[in-house]
């Protein structure tokens, strides 16, 4: 069955999701988008992308529609989600990717207006369930869960790596740092911002800031609740990030044993979400990689029962591919 999707917020994640649908061949049809930007600009930004390159097909727009190839879909510009009638366009699932409606009590408006399910492309509040594909997606219950969070890109990287280690060695506690590409909420030049570190010019600074990824791990791996914490270092690249995780585990081990356990998980239960590599890669090598986490075996360090590992991730493309997977998964039980 084709899953019909509406996208609220056609920014970086909204457009990456659209491209990922096309690239994956998933049985998903985008029937409408809602964004306050004019349609001509939206079409241009979909057609030309500084990271992904030119869209492989014709893209055009009118005042009411965007056309990609031979497929047209509605484009609305409603500030208030309450004015969106998703039932009129037949949307089964709405991707909430504006960044403004991360509280499920607000995002639920999409369901009130005709969508069967709502997926928030960010960490959320009051959601029915937070899902990281490959880690806890089997907890999804179509009867109970209407508003779902896809967690953050960093949690999607951290969780598979942590699960692989915890399942074999039992994580006691740990700290993580995400070396993260700059994002749209930072400044190009120094200027006012609620976070005074993020107020500084993104392209010429390493910017320490907060991340909720480590604490959020307890939402998808309850046995690790309260056992991880960390922060982010935003760096001057537009995409391509890395999560550095250091944990104490239940027994002494070796780097070889840790790598073997992660490799087994990447080839087994976490295949497609966790990828294992022994190549000496850098961040640009994983741009457009669809995996949630690319485990870098060459960076594994072990001292007794202390384990340090690194996983790369394309914080836009990898995350958007998980949205495609989640839509497909949820769509099976509509």
Predicted regions and their residues:
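Generic secondary-structure signature for well-ordered alpha-helical cores
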Residues: 22-26, 163-171, 181-184, 211, ...
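Hydrophobic alpha-helical scaffolding
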Residues: 151-152, 206-208, 248, 313
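C-terminal active-site/capping subdomain that shapes the small-molecule cofactor and substrate pocket
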Residues: 230, 242, 246-334
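Acidic, glycine-rich segments within the central catalytic cores of soluble metabolic enzymes
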Residues: 167, 171-238
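Alpha-helical scaffold segments in soluble metabolic enzymes
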Residues: 12, 16, 20, 44, ...
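N-terminal Rossmann-like NAD(P) cofactor-binding subdomain of oxidoreductases
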Residues: 1-199, 301, 325, 333-334
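Short clusters of hydrophobic/aromatic residues that line enzyme substrate/ligand-binding pockets
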Residues: 66, 131-133, 147, 188-189, ...
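Short, solvent-exposed beta-strand edge segments and adjacent coil->beta transition regions
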Residues: 144-145, 201-203, 240-244, 306-308
């Amino acid at each position: 069955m084709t899953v019909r999707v509406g996208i609220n917020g056609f920014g970086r994640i909204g457009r990456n999701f659209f491209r990922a649908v096309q690239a994956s061949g998933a049985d998903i049809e985008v029937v409408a988008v809602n964004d306050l930007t004019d349609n001509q600009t939206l079409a241009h930004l979909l057609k030309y992308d500084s990271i992904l390159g030119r869209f492989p097909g014709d893209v055009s727009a009118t005042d009411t529609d965007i056309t990609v190839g031979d497929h047209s879909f509605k484009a609305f510009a409603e500030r208030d989600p309450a004015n969106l009638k998703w039932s009129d366009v037949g949307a089964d699932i709405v991707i909430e990717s504006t960044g403004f409606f991360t509280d499920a009590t607000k995002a639920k408006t999409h369901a009130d207006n005709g969508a069967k399910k709502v997926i928030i492309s960010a960490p959320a509040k009051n959601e029915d369930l937070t899902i990281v594909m490959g880690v806890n997606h089997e907890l999804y219950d179509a009867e109970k869960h209407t508003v779902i969070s896809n967690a953050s890109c960093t949690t999607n990287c951290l969780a598979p790596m942590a699960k692989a280690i915890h399942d074999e060695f039992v994580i006691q506690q740990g700290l993580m740092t995400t070396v993260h590409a700059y994002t749209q909420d930072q400044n190009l030049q120094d200027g006012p911002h609620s976070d005074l570190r993020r107020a500084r010019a993104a392209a010429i600074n390493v910017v320490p800031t907060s991340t909720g990824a480590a604490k959020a791990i307890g939402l998808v791996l309850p046995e690790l609740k309260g056992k991880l914490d960390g922060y982010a270092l935003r760096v001057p690249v537009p995409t391509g990030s890395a999560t550095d995780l250091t944990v104490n585990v239940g027994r002494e081990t070796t780097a070889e044993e840790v790598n073997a356990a992660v490799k087994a998980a990447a080839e087994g239960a976490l295949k497609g979400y966790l990828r294992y590599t022994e190549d000496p890669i850098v961040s640009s090598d994983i741009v457009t990689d669809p995996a949630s986490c690319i485990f870098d075996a060459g960076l594994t360090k072990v001292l007794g029962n202390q384990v340090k590992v690194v996983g790369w991730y394309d914080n836009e493309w990898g995350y958007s591919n998980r949205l495609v997977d989640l839509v497909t998964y949820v769509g099976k039980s509509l």
